[in-house]
Amino acid sequence: RTQLLLSAPNGGTPEQLYYGSRTSDADIRSICETARGRNAYPVYGMGYPCETALSVRHADGNLTLQMAVIGVKETRLTEENATLTVIELKDKVYPFFVNICYKAWQDADVIETWTEIRHEEKKPVQLQQFASAYLPVRRGNVWLAHLSGAWANEGQLCQEALQPGMKVIKNTDGVRNSQSAHAEVMFSLDGKPQENTGRVIGAALCYSGNYKLRIDTQEDDWHHFLAGINEENSWYNLKKEEVFRTPAL
């Protein structure tokens, strides 16, 4: 079983503290007291040095975002045997809102995540980047497995060690979004993948259109994984009170 620990102080930045095997209550307390968290949904505009999940152009032309927690809601979905946790964010200057949603399936050991974006600005806000999710993966001997190919040769397994720089898996073919690549990856945390041993993290984007998966490895201690709709030539003008929901990862 896996476990995701989040910190969402009112007025502060939402952070991911831990993702991995289930821990004891004592370990959870220790992690919450000592862990240095990573921004749960990094946005563009306030000095964040790595790849961002969200960037926008406000109605007045400004590109800056600075999101803060305004609430947390948790709902038990009995019929689905799942728990839905929603971290509500608001920009510190603009009436711009983001909900980070986590749906934990208790019987499948799967955590589904997506975002819901809306605003109350006077004119439309242009969404220029809108990833579904962000996951930091601790650097080490981490390998990436993904599928590639071409016509009549689809689904070829590619395995590679993650190196400094950017790794991008994307599609711009529309309805043919699984011919040359797939929106699914698997991270092997203990070196080159083995059939019967080792820790892995799997991720699949539930989207039938153009997608982009990014892995940004810089000078810090993390591989920064982001996945969502491919925003190239696809900026979206979000109307006031309209809700833009990203596909689930």
Regions found by a protein language model. Give the residues of each.
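Polysaccharide-binding surfaces and accessory modules of carbohydrate-active proteins
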Residues: 2-216, 222-223, 232-235
